[in-house]
């Protein structure tokens, strides 16, 4: 609003005030025009107050009286913002100074009386208003000082009340459509309410005489509708029922308000009016062959005429057409009901055949809304929403809304039935969904039970097996029904097998026995009769007359067969046993170690002190068992027995093979691989050695403690030492025997 105030406007106001306060007769029209200028805030209220004060301080009493009358008119019509300037100390002290002036500056008695009258009336009208309280203080002060006021006249406070343009309100968005202001979407203020609007919401312009604004200024759409509605009511133009908005009679020239047709054309969009017209035409065209002649020309006949008057016949014809359309719609609904009832009866009786039912489609349910009815409902909802921003009486002057309301009101039972059917369908679908969910849940449970049952059966057949067998070592056992070994040399292997003959695994296939179980363990006995459970149960050979075809011979190489009646000595003379086979059991096919601990300098490193203690105890037990009578095998031995020779025979039969000199000891480590690759040329069965042992019992040869055979374990094979261990001393006396 500061843009309104300019020096040009102030100069124009000064000229008008000078003209109104001239010494001629008072011009009331000019006074009201000046008050409207002040009220419209075209000029600053302070500048207007100072212009009036200047004219009041004039030396001409007539000018002073005219200025006082003009000031009173402006106080009563200038608005609250001008009243605040009149009640200021600057203006009131100027009036008091005129009252107290003495000497040449004394004012005229009429001017003096007029000033006291105005102060008294203004103070009476401003009672109870805080912003105008200084006028009352001046009035009371003058009363105390003894100034004689004229008789008091009761003046209502409404005398000084006048509408003025409100203060402008600032905002970042449009206060109607909430669109943000940008560089292109500029901000505009409504002169009627002072709010912020954008361009599309404040395109209207109207003069505001109630605010003292006589020229057309910018207003928003809401204020425009309110002001034009008030103006149409004030003009006394009766509302007209027409297809579209018709113009009202022309206003007198003195009225600056726009006619009603301008408001109507701007208030509603053209497309909305076209939609209304098309909807009504469609309703009429869908009736049962009913086409009225006025209906075809209804849109053109109901358009506003140039003179602003609509034909009354068009209104009557429109009402008749609407009645006919409603009647046709009701008749169509009744016919649909009858068709639906007939279709239901036909389905119940079962008389309709598939051939006859194919060409004729079932009619729609009478409770279903047609697309046209749904469109009318949506259109009516849109119109009602648009009416929220229209003046209160707009709904009474819109025949289209009334017609839509009547037609939609007839659809309420149909809509209620549609809603009920939809709810029943919804409940049915919910019930079916619950049943389906239950069935699916039962089916899933059944599948889970079947799967679990199948898995359990499969686990019994293949996955739930008993514990795995013990991992076989290098000397697995034979069949449990193998015949026992003959001779006292096999007594050591009748018990549990030593754990040293197997690789240490997670499962202990061979438990560790105590040392007391090895009753007749010595160097010779361990070689002559190994335990029957040291060999894998691959095949159980048949009892034959010779040893060669046995299955165990396939593991340890081809061995010569001897008849049972051959003397042991003859076999011993023909045999030249290898010391590697005499001192250690034959290895498994996957084992390359076959030398004796005493003959191999590298192998003697692998025996611990525990093995030495074990050997000493076994030698003592062997001496006790050798005193007992030994049995000679009366029948050929079981081919399942070990093919190793029994070294318990007289030592003179194999003296050439046992003596070893220190010079020959270093050459022994190369024999194990050769012994494993090539079998010996001649080797005696163990029963011949047993027979020779019974004939002659030589003194027992005590081997050194370090020569005891403790078996092979996984811990017994570290990296071969690079130094030659100390060899035990061999007794020469035993060699001479």
Curated annotation (Swiss-Prot):
Zinc finger (FYVE-type): 168-228
Domain of life, per lineage: Eukaryota
Alphabetized SUPFAM superfamilies for the sequence: ENTH/VHS domain (SSF48464), FYVE/PHD zinc finger (SSF57903)
InterPro entries named in the record: ENTH_VHS (IPR008942), HGS/VPS27 (IPR017073), UIM_dom (IPR003903), VHS_dom (IPR002014), Vps27_GAT-like (IPR049425), Znf_FYVE (IPR000306), Znf_FYVE-rel (IPR017455), Znf_FYVE_PHD (IPR011011)
Subcellular location: Endosome membrane
GO biological process: protein targeting to vacuole; protein transport to vacuole involved in ubiquitin-dependent protein catabolic process via the multivesicular body sorting pathway
Pro residues bias (residue ranges): 465-486
Major location category of this protein: membrane
Protein name per Swiss-Prot or TrEMBL: Vacuolar protein sorting-associated protein 27
Species, as recorded: Chaetomium globosum (strain ATCC 6205 / CBS 148.51 / DSM 1962 / NBRC 6347 / NRRL 1970)
Gene of this entry: VPS27
